[in-house]
A protein has these predicted regions:
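Short helix-capping/turn signature of helix-turn-helix
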Residues: 61, 118-124
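An amphipathic alpha-helix adjacent to DNA-recognition modules
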Residues: 19-27, 39-40, 51, 59-84, ...
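Conserved hydrophobic residue
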Residues: 38-39, 152-154
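Amphipathic alpha-helical packing segments from all-alpha helical-bundle domains
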Residues: 77-81, 125-150, 159-163, 171, ...
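C-terminal peripheral helix-coil segments that are non-catalytic and often amphipathic
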Residues: 1-9, 93, 106-110, 142-149, ...
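Basic, helix-initiating cap at the start of DNA-binding domains
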Residues: 1-36, 44-49, 66
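Hydrophobic alpha-helical connector segments
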Residues: 70, 81-110, 161-165, 189
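Key DNA-contact positions within bacterial/archaeal DNA-binding proteins
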Residues: 55
Length: 214
């Protein structure tokens, strides 16, 4: 846990009512901060959006930065959970990639403010910005490395590959989903996956240049 996270460690409510109220505040923060930006969003607006008294906010979060950090962590957890559930039981890495990308785009279509929230994290709290991407990459790296061992995909640096694939997801989603406010067209998704399949395709080791043929 980073220093900034330790300073803002927040005890989660134990009652069902408390958890509902906390989630309402996080949902409101996603809407307000995603729309207005962190600097222009206010706690008053967040509580009004959530339908709770302003004082209620401070029962759950000490300040606006704290709710922002929790929002980033909540979005990260929800995204990773949805992808994990979608690919559970799948064995083929290329199929996992296809289902994983579909799930990512469905999630970002549902949480349209995710892009803006995560981009702002770099300037609000750099530690949580790095944590978001590293946490997302951790499982990805493990899965890619396992697929390389099974010779399902070509052998590359799994961390480098994970970040390349994450970059594809982010920018394709931004161009064809966030900017147009519509789901990604099937033809764009298919072309993206054709590129990924070609890049990941397993290549048996080539013979040495000096090998003699019969």
């Amino acid at each position: 846990v980073s220093d900034s996270e330790e300073k803002r460690l927040i005890k989660r409510p134990v009652t069902r009512r408390g958890r509902r109220t906390r989630q309402k505040l996080l949902d409101a923060a996603e809407a307000i901060i995603g729309e207005k930006g962190f600097d222009n969003a206010s706690i008053v607006e967040i509580t009004q959006q959530a339908g709770v008294a302003q004082g209620t906010f401070y029962i759950y979060f000490p300040d606006k930065t704290a709710v922002f950090i929790e929002l980033v962590k909540e979005l990260s957890h929800s995204l990773r959970r949805e992808i994990a559930e979608a690919v559970a039981g799948l064995e083929d890495r290329l199929e996992i990639e296809q289902v994983g990308f579909r799930t990512f785009f469905r999630f970002t279509h549902k949480h349209r403010k995710l892009y803006r929230v995560v981009r702002q994290a770099e300037f609000v709290d750099e530690d949580i910005f790095k944590w978001y991407h590293r946490r997302l990459a951790e499982g990805y790296v493990r899965g890619l490395a396992e697929a390389m061992e099974k010779e399902q995909i070509r052998r590359l640096d799994p961390e480098c590959l994970a970040y390349c694939l994450m970059g594809i997801a982010v920018f394709v989603g931004m161009r064809w989903e966030i900017w147009t406010k519509e789901p990604i067209p099937d033809e764009i998704f298919d072309q993206m996956m054709a590129f990924i399949r070609h890049g990941l395709a397993f290549c048996p080791a080539e013979p040495d240049d000096g090998a003699q043929s019969d």
